[in-house]
Design a protein with these regions (language model features):
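Glycine-rich and polybasic anion-binding loops at the starts of cofactor/ligand-binding domains
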Residues: 2-258
Length: 258
């Protein structure tokens, strides 16, 4: 009986909302392919610190030295020369849904993200192609010392927290696509919960890949100190296209004792 109810709930999901395609508008798109020049341009576009560029270039060298893992599915038709590794949407990051362009707002409305935030979430991040376009967190969490920001902001504003953990749980040498991720990562989330703090409502990050022929490479890093806890939800979706898209995100989760 329980299995029948579970199947019914899954079957009742309206999957058509995921397949609605938006017109692709961007303010910057990197050249297709994977070269040192492209990596440098992505890093410059993001105005990253030098240490992060060096991490990217190291990962690129590792990527070039590794074969596709033998346990991977057949992806022989995947050609990185035909993948857009970085697409910046035609908007900067907003803290209010109503400030987003209408097409992006409509996308997340269909997916139910704004409604979920109103009802049951302590914070929300929403990424569209390569960049987080919306991010908001309740004031109460900030007052408790909880950090929940997009990963680009974390790299620039919380470097002392990021550097000891970034790339330590999932290393670029883990496999070829881990190396690819670290070479071209963009977007994602950073969560830090101080010692003894209990985050009572969930945090959620949602990643929408809209452009055909694009890749999405968000990085999520979560640090939960001793005696603390939080509930983090991550979701993603993309329309169906007749060209190859690639998703190679990474999540690193560090939970201290207690």
């Amino acid at each position: 009986m329980a299995e029948e109810k579970k199947k019914s709930r899954i079957d009742d999901i309206n999957r058509s909302v995921y397949d609605i395609k938006d017109e692709v508008e961007f303010s910057y798109k990197a050249d297709r392919g994977l070269t040192e020049d492209i990596i440098r341009k992505i890093s410059a576009e993001k105005e990253e610190p030098a240490w992060m560029l060096e991490k990217r270039l190291q990962a690129l060298r590792i990527y070039e030295s590794l074969d596709v893992p033998p346990w991977a599915p057949d992806i022989s038709e995947l050609d990185m020369d035909h993948i857009d590794t970085y697409i910046r949407p035609k908007t900067d990051r907003k803290a209010r849904w109503e400030d987003l362009p209408q097409n992006i707002r409509d996308t997340f409305d269909r997916l139910g993200i704004p409604e979920a935030e109103k009802k049951s979430l302590a914070g929300v991040g929403a990424q569209y192609d390569s960049e987080v376009v919306y991010h908001n967190v309740q004031k109460e969490l900030k007052e408790q010392g909880v950090i929940y920001v997009d990963f680009e902001t974390a790299v620039k504003e919380y470097e002392d927290l990021i550097k000891p953990y970034f790339g330590q749980l999932i290393t670029p040498r883990y496999h070829k696509f881990a190396a690819l991720h670290y070479a071209v990562w963009s977007g994602g989330s950073f969560v830090y919960v101080p010692k003894g703090v209990h985050v009572r409502m969930p945090l959620q990050s949602y990643f929408r890949l809209n452009a055909p022929g694009a890749g999405q490479f968000e990085h999520t890093l979560i640090i939960v100190e001793e005696g603390a806890d939080c509930h983090f939800i991550e979701g993603c979706s993309a329309p169906r296209y007749n060209v190859a898209n690639l998703h190679a995100g990474a999540v690193e989760l560090f939970v201290k004792k207690g």
